[in-house]
């Protein structure tokens, strides 16, 4: 059992995120939650993975459409701000990216207003994330045409969930 309690997070130290993430691409997924909690996020320079170089353009464009400002000029990574919070938006992914779908879900659940995400990925891990967010109080519906509708809520609550096994690592 893993228990994560982030209710008192006031700072996300860049060095800690960089050290804990290694060459993982996971830090980009911290952006939405950090923007909601702190009004800013710093994402260290991300590498690729076993697949090769993988741009994060869809992630950044999603955050921009939700109201964030993205500064890619920082020498050590990407600085993202949303001092006035995030807001709902209509977003279309030109490719059903798993990471960009996760990014949109994690950022939109606490955004002010409604978000419509079309062209989304619907892999089992995505549907499991939707189930987790719904257990936490998120309002999300998924249409058969891969369109997600997310109604922002003021807060999420704790939950108990058994995660799926990793299909790639299994």
Language-model regions, residue ranges each:
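Structural preference for solvent-exposed beta-strand-turn elements
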Residues: 1-170
């Amino acid at each position: 059992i893993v228990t994560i309690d982030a209710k008192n997070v006031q700072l996300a130290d860049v060095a800690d995120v960089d050290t804990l993430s290694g060459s993982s691409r996971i830090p980009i997924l911290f952006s939405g939650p950090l923007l909601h909690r702190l009004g800013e996020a710093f994402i260290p320079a991300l590498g690729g993975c076993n697949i090769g170089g993988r741009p994060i353009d869809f992630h950044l464009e999603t955050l921009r459409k939700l109201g964030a400002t993205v500064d890619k000029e920082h020498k050590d990574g990407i600085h993202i701000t949303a001092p006035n919070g995030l807001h709902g938006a209509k977003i279309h992914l030109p490719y059903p990216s798993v990471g960009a779908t996760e990014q949109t879900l994690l950022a939109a659940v606490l955004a002010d207003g409604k978000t419509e995400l079309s062209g989304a990925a619907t892999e089992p891990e995505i549907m499991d994330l939707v189930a987790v967010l719904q257990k936490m109080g998120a309002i999300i519906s998924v249409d058969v045409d891969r369109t997600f509708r997310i109604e922002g809520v003021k807060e999420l609550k704790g939950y108990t969930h058994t995660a799926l096994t990793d299909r790639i690592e299994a």
